[in-house]
């Protein structure tokens, strides 16, 4: 009887829609929002004592942000910080730094309020067409000396496309 109940409750796992997952992440304080990215930038800046924060890249998914910054000890390596707001897709709060290898890309300064992820997501969803949702957001320099680019990956569940969003920084 217990096994049948467990099996019956597992049968519903595959029927959860992306909208339900996104709604649940938002309810728990997550989602890919300007607020989430600002909270992550603020947490790393506070922990490292750097404001504005020198950044190699920022990668945001549902309720989780990963920020790569120059190593705090001045070595050519990078420190990788993770910030999550939801138990649904990872831990709560700030974790790190994990040490990564050297980076060829230069840094750019980011302070709370510098990035409008909400507007970039809306622009990308419009470009992606009906029924698309934001899967991830990346902010990085495409090369040394280049301006940072905000790229948004949108999907309809079957296919994904990356859209570079102008003027989001």
Residue ranges and their predicted role:
Residues 11-14:
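Bacterial signal peptide processing site
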Residues 43-81, 138-165:
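Exposed beta-strand-loop-beta-strand "reactive/processing" segments of non-cytosolic proteins
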Residues 1-4:
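Sec-dependent N-terminal signal peptides
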Residues 25, 82-89:
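N-terminal non-globular leader segments, chiefly Sec-dependent signal peptides
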Residues 6-9:
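C-terminal motif of bacterial Sec signal peptides marking the signal peptidase cleavage site
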Residues 21-57, 134-137:
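A cross-kingdom feature marking solvent-exposed beta-strand/loop segments within repeated
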Residues 87-135:
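Long, charged/polar, surface-exposed segments that mediate recognition or autoinhibition
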């Amino acid at each position: 009887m217990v096994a049948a109940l467990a099996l019956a409750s597992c049968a519903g796992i595959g029927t959860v829609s992306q909208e339900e997952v996104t709604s649940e992440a938002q309810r728990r304080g997550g989602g890919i929002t300007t607020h989430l990215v600002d909270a992550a930038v603020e947490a790393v800046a506070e922990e490292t004592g750097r404001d504005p924060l020198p950044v190699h890249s920022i990668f945001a998914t549902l309720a989780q942000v990963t920020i790569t910054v120059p190593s705090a000890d001045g070595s050519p390596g990078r420190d990788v910080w993770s910030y999550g707001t939801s138990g649904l897709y990872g831990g709560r709060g700030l974790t790190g730094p994990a040490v990564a290898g050297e980076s060829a890309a230069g840094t750019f300064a980011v302070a709370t309020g510098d990035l409008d992820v909400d507007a970039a997501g809306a622009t990308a969803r419009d470009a992606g067409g009906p029924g698309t949702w934001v899967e991830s957001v990346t902010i990085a320099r495409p090369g040394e000396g280049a301006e940072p680019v905000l790229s948004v990956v949108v999907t309809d569940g079957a296919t994904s496309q990356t859209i570079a969003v102008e003027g989001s920084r």
